Amino acid sequence: MSNFETVLNALPDTINSEQEAAKLLTQFQPLRNMSFELKPDTIIFCDSKDLNTALEFYKGQEHCIRAFHVLGLKEEIKNKNVKIVPFTTFTKEDNIHCFFLPDLRPACTAYRNLSIALSKLNIQEYTIEAKSASKFYRRNSFIFINNMLQTAIDNYNALEDNLSRYTYLSLWKSRHLCNPNYIPIVPYDQYWHPLASAKENDLVCEGGPANGITTIDFCKKLRNKCDIIAFEPDPVYYTNAAATCKDYQNIRLIPKGLYDFTGTLYINTDNYVKVVKQKIKEEDFECSVTSIDDYFLNAKYDKVDFIKMDIEGAELNALMGAKQILQRDKPNLAICIYHNCIDFITIPEFLRKLDLGYKFYTGHHRPWYAETVIYATAR
């Protein structure tokens, strides 16, 4: 049994003290480690677009490599030095080593795809080519606040299952050590927790459709048996989302952001796009915002069934502006808790203290800090 499985299976339902939490955290080991050297019988796992680079990179080390498993490859490639096959499956006993080309952005598509493919096989532990990851991880750093441990413990005690509990504690440790490799990647799609997702015939409130890809995904997975109200304040994203969603009659795009009041704020684009109360630089521009309560109560919708938020750090404010809808309808929730460094503490705390009978789960969907979601259901 792996360290991950051993710790996962032994987690307590509740933690009673900061000392107990600290002791538990010592048991958590990195799930993904950077490595410069190949072990015997290694399987190189890479994306098809990176295959030629990987073959050149590992030239002369073929004696350590059992095979190249390639994501996106349709048929086996004959090679006199090493076996090259399409990715099909791995076992937890395999010595898997991920190779990808480093990306200057905080998100790396190839690495994301490799890690998600492994997570869907319930494989959390593998190595990463150090030269792939070193540039990538050097860009990650988070301010960390140590005096919130008791609140984090209270959030942990409200979670429903061990995978959520493990994920939550690993978030704490990863931010403390500035190393996201402690966080497991859950085996279900983002926003689609098996017990807290949108259902057919739901009215979906989507905060942050961006280019409309997630909006279309809701429609496809719900077989178009849903109505979606999507709020996007950025005019470029709004235009792109409108083009993406133009053939869907059940999608309504609103050119506003979600916040705790109805009025005007500013969009700041220094790093990630985010909504701010005051202009930070000359290029910042005004945007309209509304609260979920103001919009849905005034529009006289009978019920909001599901709320998804990925709104660049405005999630807590938007939830504060949704108290009446949360109390009236108790919609299923999928709320991002990673944009601000303490969102993973403050947002679960806010939802927990509403005391609406929600069951809570946490899911992490990428091999870095981003894309952590708290899921909730009161159904």
Features from the language model and the residues they span:
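Phosphate/nucleotide-binding beta-alpha loop and adjacent structural elements of enzyme active sites
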Residues: 1-67, 71-379
